[in-house]
Curated annotation (Swiss-Prot):
The tegument is a granular zone surrounding the capsid. Residues 523-534 have a biased composition (Low complexity). Residues 75-84, 356-369 have a biased composition (Polar residues). This viral structural protein may have important functions, such as protein kinase activity, DNA binding, and possible transcriptional activation of immediate-early genes. This is Tegument protein. One of its GO terms (molecular function) is DNA binding. The keyword Nucleotide-binding does not apply. The keyword Transmembrane helix does not apply. The lineage of its organism: Viruses, Duplodnaviria, Heunggongvirae, Peploviricota, Herviviricetes. Keywords: DNA-binding, Phosphoprotein. Residues 50-92, 353-391, 523-542 are annotated as: Disordered.
């Protein structure tokens, strides 16, 4: 078994590297065979005694050649919640090649001597580097003030690498990455949370020119909240112009506090033909306001000294702690789908303490889990003629006879599509404290996304969809919304804003061209919720707002 490691040099076609092969005679020796010029040449093999790797990683010359990372001490790994059930440790070899930007090839790749080396040999093969497939590891080099985060999805062969130097973070995608996927969004959120709590903060995004998915996702998340004067790319197309990239990045910087003049100037209503025209969005905040706090705007382009960096780190830690103390994640329950033979069955995770979010007495209630009221409901139909009334019979039967744990119910009560939720799809229910600001609501949504994406990232479905449902609307009618993941924050905040204004949103759901939304126009039905249904003419603002999605 031979592990070949090559490093591509920029603006050069020559490939320099070494091939290390274990000797079958003595496992303590290593055959060293250098090759130059992009093709193998017959050379003399030198048997050298294999050196033991130092504690913390193999600091070979290839690792030391990194232009940014030159630590005086071995890197220290900080454990981060794993994305899968099985725990794996990061291999120093994988860490070295991932941080140095080198390409890893398959072990059984044979390079012909007669043909010229092609680009397919330099492709990053994520199956070789297992250390990034199941966990996210953060390496901090205190001397160089550089932190690196890497993650690879083995199933999608997507490699993400992040580098923080000073107050600049770089997120680079080396293979086909879809930032609309929940586990990729989870990587971004975890990266933000880790950097804001352990390092210096974020003031600018620097992204690879070939991949603009991150830029398109953030542009879509902004939605109608912020409209820059210059056009930005909101699609997943490659961006090659530096001017366009700079304009897009500048559009992400927002003021954290919105005064009345700014709100009045930027809150321009949409035309009547566009979606979401009846919902004001002036106080919904912005995603970039949380990614880029105003405390970093003075240091956006000016370098900071070490004392300034440490002071900023301490101040940012205080802000993060205050935000975490003010917001609490209340209810989280998970519907899981497992494959039993060729059939899929839904498993329910029940606890002794069950209930409903609306039955919580106050905002300081401890976190608990409860059964799902919309456990096996079908997705909304694509035909607009088919409304929510078609679900009444199935929902009423399911509400009267709850399903047992580990089963899908009888065949008579089972819909055509057994599981609305895909495998390991997380459904989170959150409650907002009374009179909570939009910024706090947004931060709470961000926490729930990280929780949901941690389970969704292990899904075996090709493209897991997310179910969005307002908890207040459950008492009147089931209004599921299967939306594209990027519209998540905008739609939920618009819907909550409508609740706070007393708008009957059961028939005024925001619609988008890329979503399938069916407004509920039927009469209220009884559900498994413990609270009584709210009448449609009740326009009072509820004391606690909540949602399940």
């Amino acid at each position: 078994m031979c592990r070949i490691r090559t490093f591509r040099l920029r603006r050069k076609r020559r490939v320099s590297g070494r091939s290390f092969c274990r000797s079958r005679i003595d496992p303590g020796y290593v055959r060293e065979r250098p090759y130059i010029g992009g093709r193998s040449r017959p050379t003399t093999f030198h048997l050298t005694r294999k050196k033991k790797a130092p504690l913390g990683g193999d600091l070979s010359p290839s690792f030391a050649r990194s232009p940014v990372l030159e630590p005086s001490s071995p890197p220290q790994a900080l454990s981060v919640p794993s994305l899968s059930s099985e725990k794996k440790t990061a291999s120093p070899t994988c860490v070295k090649h991932h941080l140095s930007g080198g390409a890893v090839r398959r072990a059984n790749t044979v390079v012909p001597r007669t043909k010229k080396r092609t680009s397919r040999h330099h492709t990053l093969m994520s199956t070789t580097c297992r250390c990034w497939s199941s966990s996210i590891v953060l390496y901090e080099h205190l001397d160089a003030r550089v932190s690196d985060v890497g993650k690879t999805s083995r199933r999608r062969r997507c490699s993400l690498g992040g580098t923080l130097s000073g107050s600049i973070i770089s997120i680079v995608a080396k293979r086909d990455c879809d930032y609309d996927e929940p586990h990729h969004l989870f990587f971004m959120l975890l990266l933000y949370k880790r950097l804001m709590s352990t390092t210096l903060g974020i003031s600018h995004l620097v992204k690879h020119a070939r991949f603009s998915s991150l830029q398109g996702t953030l542009g879509s998340l902004k939605g109608t909240v912020y409209r820059p004067k210059q056009k930005t790319h909101t699609c997943n197309r490659s961006t090659t112009s530096n001017d366009t990239k700079t304009q897009s990045y500048n559009a992400l910087f927002m003021e954290r506090t919105w005064n009345k003049k700014t709100i009045a100037a930027r809150a321009k209503p949409k035309p009547s033909g566009e979606a979401g025209a009846s919902f004001p969005t002036q106080s919904l905040g912005s995603l970039s306001s949380f990614f880029f706090p105003d405390s970093l705007k003075n240091h956006r382009h000016s370098p900071m000294t070490r004392n300034q960096l440490l002071e900023h780190k301490r101040s940012q830690q205080v802000e993060t702690n205050k935000l975490d103390d003010a917001i609490t994640l209340y209810c989280v329950y998970i519907d899981r789908c497992e494959f039993v033979g060729k059939k899929r069955r839904c498993m329910m995770h029940n606890d002794r303490e069950t209930g409903d979010c609306s039955s919580l007495p106050n905002a300081n209630t401890q976190t608990h889990r409860f059964p799902s009221p919309h456990k096996e409901m079908r997705p909304p139909p694509t035909n607009e003629a088919d409304s929510c009334s078609s679900y009444d019979g199935a929902l009423a039967r399911r509400a009267s006879s709850p399903l047992r744990e580990g089963t899908s119910g009888s065949s008579a009560h089972r819909p055509k599509q057994q599981c609305l939720l895909h495998c390991h799809q997380s459904i989170s229910c959150i409650l907002f404290p009374p009179n909570s600001s939009p910024q706090h609501q947004f931060a709470l949504l961000r926490k729930v996304v990280a929780t949901a994406a941690a389970a969704t990232g292990r899904s075996s479905s090709p493209r897991p969809q997310t179910l969005y449902m307002c908890r207040k609307c459950v008492n009147t009618c089931y209004c599921p919304m299967r939306l594209v993941h990027r519209y998540m924050f905008q739609n939920l905040l618009i819907h909550l804003r409508a609740h706070r204004l007393g708008v009957s949103s059961s028939s005024n759901w925001p619609t988008f061209s890329t979503t399938v939304v069916n407004p509920c126009t039927t009469t209220p039905i009884k559900t498994t919720s413990s609270s009584s249904p709210r009448p449609r003419n009740d326009t009072r603002s509820p004391p606690i707002l909540g949602m399940c999605f």
